[in-house]
């Protein structure tokens, strides 16, 4: 990144931010789809039942913890790879 001039660094940063937003939206969409499909079963009311609310809360917490854990593993692997390459 040090080899890039200021304009190139700015463009690179913009691309990184766009990718992060895209990844976040993919994560969020996956969370909504999965938890809705697994938890919402009663379409006779526009409100969630207490059972559905509880299920969605547990589902979203589990999904986010899993995603966080996967991210940590990627960081660990990248660090190990970086050390292996002599960085």
UniProtKB/Swiss-Prot annotation:
Short motif Twin CX3C motif, span: 35-59
Gene Ontology MF annotations: metal ion binding; protein transporter activity; unfolded protein binding
GO CC field: extracellular region; mitochondrial intermembrane space protein transporter complex; TIM22 mitochondrial import inner membrane insertion complex
Protein location: Mitochondrion inner membrane
Keyword Cytoplasm included in the entry's annotation: no
Keyword vocabulary terms for this entry: Chaperone, Disulfide bond, Membrane, Metal-binding, Mitochondrion, Mitochondrion inner membrane, Protein transport, Translocation, Transport, Zinc
Membrane topology classification: Peripheral membrane protein
Gene Ontology terms describing biological process: protein insertion into mitochondrial inner membrane
Disulphide-bonded residues: 35-59, 39-55
Database matches in Pfam families: zf-Tim10_DDP
Principal place of residence: mitochondrion
InterPro entries from the UniProt entry: Mito_inner_translocase_sub, Tim10-like, Tim10-like_dom_sf
PANTHER family for this protein: MITOCHONDRIAL IMPORT INNER MEMBRANE TRANSLOCASE SUBUNIT TIM9B
Function: Mitochondrial intermembrane chaperone that participates in the import and insertion of multi-pass transmembrane proteins into the mitochondrial inner membrane. Also required for the transfer of beta-barrel precursors from the TOM complex to the sorting and assembly machinery (SAM complex) of the outer membrane. Acts as a chaperone-like protein that protects the hydrophobic precursors from aggregation and guide them through the mitochondrial intermembrane space.
Record comment regarding domains: The twin CX3C motif contains 4 conserved Cys residues that form 2 disulfide bonds in the mitochondrial intermembrane space. However, during the transit of TIM9 from cytoplasm into mitochondrion, the Cys residues probably coordinate zinc, thereby preventing folding and allowing its transfer across mitochondrial outer membrane.
Family: Belongs to the small Tim family.
Quaternary structure (record): Heterohexamer; composed of 3 copies of TIM9 and 3 copies of TIM10, named soluble 70 kDa complex. Associates with the TIM22 complex, whose core is composed of TIM22 and TIM54. Interacts with the transmembrane regions of multi-pass transmembrane proteins in transit.
Protein name: Mitochondrial import inner membrane translocase subunit TIM9
């Amino acid at each position: 990144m040090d080899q890039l001039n200021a304009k190139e660094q700015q463009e690179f940063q913009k691309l990184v931010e766009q990718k992060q937003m895209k990844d976040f939206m993919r994560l969020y969409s996956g969370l909504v789809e999965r938890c809705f499909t697994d938890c919402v079963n009663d379409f006779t009311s526009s409100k969630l039942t207490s059972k559905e609310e509880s299920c969605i809360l547990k589902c979203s917490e589990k999904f986010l913890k899993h995603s966080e854990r996967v991210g940590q593993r990627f960081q660990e692997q990248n660090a190990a790879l970086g050390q292996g390459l002599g960085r």
